[in-house]
Amino acid sequence: MFTIKNFDELTNTELYAICAQRVAVFVVEQNCPYQDIDGLDPRCQHMFVMNNGEIDAYLRVFDRGTVDDHHSPRREGVASLGRIITGPKARGKGMGHQLVAAGIEHVRTTMPHVHTIFISAQEHLAETYYGKHGFERVSEVYLEDDIPHVDMELKL
Amino acid sequence: MFTAKKFSDLTVEELNAIYIARSKVFTVGQQLTVQEPDLADRQAVHFFSQNDAGEVVAYMRLIDLEKIEDDHYEQVSGAYALSRVAVLKTLRGQGMGRKLLDAAIQWVRDETEATKIIIDAQAYLRDSYYAPVGFVQVGEEFREAGLPHVKMILEL
């Protein structure tokens, strides 16, 4: 159901659709003018479902052992899931949970050295959404771009 | 110095670099929570300059108003529009914006049959940036994305 691609395998139409939907959700809908297109995407794998040229569900995965970014310092054996969204038209159908489950499964099956999956979750989703997949809080609540977040980890 | 490419001719790296630059200048720089990127990208010519690291440092998109099919652009025969005109903050004050505008106008002269260029300019740039190369204001100031704008036309 979900397509997963390395950055250089994305078509321009796919990258457009991904960036447009991420901005639609994180910048426009949440009224948060931050730099969503942050430069990390070339080092991520991108998991998504597209429907009529629009992204219904999306996340990006990266190996923290190979990435060193000011938001995501290097951590061996850790993979991050980020920018997790379902598009407005795709909500209420359980697709978000399928997406997170598929993301976890992708890490389990393709990154054998990874023992922990990390997310920086919007706090209101911590238990209702990520907790259902086994993620546990590992930090206090903090503000990122004025939105309460909490770090969560899933031990594989 | 400047590259002009249709959407489908861009590499995915170039498209990503364009979106990073636009995100920095408009979303973060001007604290705008509008939809960025938008669908017009797929019908535009992307006009940009990159530094040695591949970062897009100056950018605009050129839209053939005779052919455009998009909710945000009215069709006008014989006209091109310039939009999303952006120079990275680190490059400002060095004449880069002027070179970008001159080169884009020259591109429209050389590569198209258009007889005029239309821009919805941010009002603060009317006299300092667009008027000196011949753009003339038409109509009253209006607000778009919460910012004062003016429509300006350059007859070629």
Regions from the PLM with identified roles:
Chain B
Residues 1-55:
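Short amphipathic alpha-helix that is part of the acyltransferase structural core
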Residues 48, 55-71, 81-86:
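Conserved beta-strand in the GNAT
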Residues 87, 93-106:
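Conserved acetyl-CoA-binding loop-helix of GNAT-fold acetyltransferases
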Residues 123-140, 145-146:
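Conserved active-site alpha-helix within GNAT-family acetyltransferase domains
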Residues 32-34, 44-48, 59, 84, ...:
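Short hydrophobic/aromatic beta-strand element in the GNAT-like acyltransferase core
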